């Protein structure tokens, strides 16, 4: 084996180097999605490979980086400017991507370009770079933070095998960056040490994670992606319970459920005598909803 393929999630440069050194096998990274039927782009097997990019577009595939400007107009981004990756190809069935009609609304730009929900840029040589997911952005007091920068920094640590950065609820800023990691077998490092590591490897101060937690294993999808909804549930539970403890209230979050209309909803249980409005005052300062459970 001389070449292997990587997809499903952006490949950190540090992981690429580790894999190539350990196996002497070169990785060709590409990008595709079910909604477009097949692959969208790939690094050339025999041509120039740009590590960290997902290569150049396939034949008969058109890729544009688009953004919405003031007034609602949609325009193309400049070279190396980050926007939403939008794809038109024979594999994109405009208006019929999903069987549920509601899901197809606002899913296309200019009638045929599928909005992938992925953020990326195209460099002057035509190589596509994925920078994150629009819905994964951490919004701290109105400031957008790309979790990929935090994850790249954590994966640069020799003890870290997998990392997932998300926004944890905050009563003042809306969200603050935090991260969860899975360690390399036999490695040892604390969350506090990784927080300090990020302070020297994450360039933007606002993106420094306020909390890093080491888990025995990160939740993953069937294709090996870090499953961030489970991490968000952990963060909601941790931050809400910390707020309840600080307020000395007899209540705790016992679960976080995924409601189709409201999103993630904390389930709060009474652990003693208290007034309902006291809990409402504390948890009402956060953006994520909550409900009482018996």
Predicted segments, located by residue:
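Proline-centered helix-kink/hinge sites
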Residues: 12-13, 26, 38, 57, ...
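Conserved AMP-binding/adenylate-forming
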Residues: 2-6, 11-30, 34-128, 134-137, ...
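Short proline/glycine- and acidic-rich turn/helix-capping motifs at secondary-structure junctions
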Residues: 211-223, 293-294
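AMP-binding/adenylate-forming catalytic core of the ANL superfamily
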Residues: 67, 89, 95, 103-106, ...
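Residues at the N-termini of beta-strands
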Residues: 3, 84, 161-162, 211
């Amino acid at each position: 084996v001389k070449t292997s393929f990587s997809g499903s999630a952006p490949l950190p440069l540090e992981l690429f180097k580790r894999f190539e050194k350990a196996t002497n096998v070169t990785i060709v990274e590409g990008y595709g999605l079910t909604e477009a039927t097949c692959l969208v782009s790939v690094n050339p097997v025999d041509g120039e490979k740009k590590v960290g990019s997902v290569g150049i577009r396939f034949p008969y595939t058109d890729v544009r980086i688009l953004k919405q400007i003031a007034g609602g107009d949609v325009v193309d981004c400049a070279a190396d400017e980050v926007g939403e990756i939008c794809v038109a190809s024979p594999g994109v069935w405009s208006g019929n991507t999903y069987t549920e009609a509601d899901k197809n609304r606002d899913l296309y730009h200019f009638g045929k370009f599928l909005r992938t929900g992925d953020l990326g840029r195209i460099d002057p040589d035509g190589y596509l770079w994925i920078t994150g997911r629009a819905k994964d952005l951490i919004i701290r007091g109105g400031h957008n933070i790309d979790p990929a920068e935090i994850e790249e920094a954590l994966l640069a640590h020799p003890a870290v095998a997998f990392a997932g950065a998300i926004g944890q609820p905050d009563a003042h800023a809306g969200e603050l960056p935090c991260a969860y990691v899975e360690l390399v077998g036999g490695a040892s490092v604390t969350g506090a040490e990784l927080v300090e590591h990020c302070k020297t490897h994450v360039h933007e101060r606002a993106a420094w994670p306020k909390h890093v937690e080491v888990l025995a294993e990160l939740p993953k999808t069937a294709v090996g992606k870090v499953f961030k909804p489970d991490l968000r549930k952990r963060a909601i539970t941790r931050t809400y319970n910390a707020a309840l403890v600080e307020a000395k209230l007899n209540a705790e979050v016992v679960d976080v459920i995924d409601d189709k209309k409201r999103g993630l909803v904390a389930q709060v249980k009474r652990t003693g005598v208290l007034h309902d409005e006291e809990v409402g005052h504390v948890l009402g300062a956060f953006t994520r909803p909550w409900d009482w459970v018996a």
